Amino acid sequence: MLRYTIGAAFAVVFCLSSFLIDQKPVVKTARENYQTYCSSCHGEKVEAFVDRKWKHGTGKAELMTSISGGYPDLGMPTWKATLNEKEIGELADLILESLKNVDQYKFASKPTSNVFSSEGQTVKLDTIAKDLGSPWGLAFLPEGDMLVSTRSGDIYRVGQNQQKTKISGGPTVLAEGQGGLLDVVLHPDFAKNQFVYFSYSAVKNEGDQKLSTTAIMRAKLAGNTLTDQKVIFEAMPYSKTRHHYGSRMAFDNKGYLFVSVGERGNEKENPQSIANDLGKVHRLYDDGRIPEDNPFVKDKNARGSIYSYGHRNPQGMLKHPVTGEIWTNEHGPRGGDELNIVKKGANYGWPIICYGINYDGKPITNLTAKEGMEQPLTYWLPSIAPSGLAFVDSPKYPGWKGNLLIGSLRFQYLNRCVMEGNKVVKQENLLKNVGRLRNIKQGPDGYLYVSVEEPGYIFRLQPVNQ
């Protein structure tokens, strides 16, 4: 399941705790609790998230308060009903102990070799760009450069030899929790119209509350400047939470723009209601208008842009290179991440059916299937926290031909799915420990590119002769 970025460095160091050496019994107990309750969000392996800042204190009492009460609006659940005071105190001790060991877990201590072997294919990581923070979206320009959107709100033009130029004119974003500047895609006719699309967490103030939502901005790229900016989509309603934005985009073969929107942490009200935009996949014309043949467009009580519903938080989306279908992957809670094909008017079941459980170990539902609700092509137990995905149809990777590659945020590897039609028949984990793998794309040059969070790398997967 996706790590909840709560803005407080408490969550960061929470992540670090899982790989501490058991120096005393209390650490062992706390570590077991971490693995049971925390690792599905915060990751299996220790990570020094250098962009996090302490907001709620570093003393034991302050940490215990954070663990006990959580930050629900930011996606951090409360644990006072699951862990007793002694266990919470031990977990706080583990966090404090982990601070002494942060440096040894930084990116530099990752595997020193940049060559990785798998069944049928060996690749070398070539560094294309670094120090990008959290590179979320990748889009390839006709001249060979790529546009990179980073969660902080910065946009870069990146060349093949680590050249990096900042692009001006991007949207104003709320870079809190899981929000920020997220995906970027080019219009299918970009060479003619220069249109670029950005998904992001838009922000507005209502009284003393700061609210946000998933929004799409279209703009023209002129050199290194964005012009003619227009917001073409805002998911309604805005929410006070800071997680589950979804935000992936893809164009299909007919030129429709598909957009994923998470349920913003309100699974009881949003994903099963077609009266709001949350927990949905939307289909739009390229200028934001609603297609006349969308499934609910004639229902006066429904949101016309909805194409499918019952989603939790889809953070991977692509067009199948052969069939043209839109595929997504989706974060489950504690277990139950999914791979789906988006179908017109379909209900994907969240939270009525689910293969996972809640973070505190309690069941969300006793159903994994129900008539009228879609089943995933595959699901993951435990959660891998899937993000970007890419089909391999390039002759540069004959050993992976036809495979589906998916980035894992939790386990920090590239998941390879061997496909027979729409069926996953085998899986393999690649690039182990490379980092939180946010995105993967196959470029027009036939090479695969991956983005890794913190300190923010983009690598080209260079095939090695075997």
Where are these regions (language model features)?
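N-terminal export/targeting leaders of redox proteins
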Residues: 1-28, 86, 119-120, 129, ...
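Beta-propeller blade signature
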Residues: 213-223, 274-287, 342-343
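Sequence/structural segment immediately N-terminal to covalent heme-attachment motifs in c-type
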Residues: 24-44, 61-69, 129
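Surface-exposed loop and turn segments in beta-propeller and other repeat-based domains
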Residues: 165-179, 229-244, 286-307, 351-381
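Extracytoplasmic electron-transfer domains, predominantly the class I c-type cytochrome c fold
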Residues: 40, 48-101, 180-181
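Acidic, Gly/Ser/Thr-rich repeat motifs that build Ca2+-stabilized beta-propeller blades
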Residues: 87-90, 95-260, 264-267, 316-319, ...
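Conserved blade-ending motifs and adjacent loop-strand segments that build the rim/top face
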Residues: 311, 424-444
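Short pre-active-site segment immediately N-terminal to redox-active cysteine/selenocysteine motifs
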Residues: 29, 34-40, 45, 75, ...
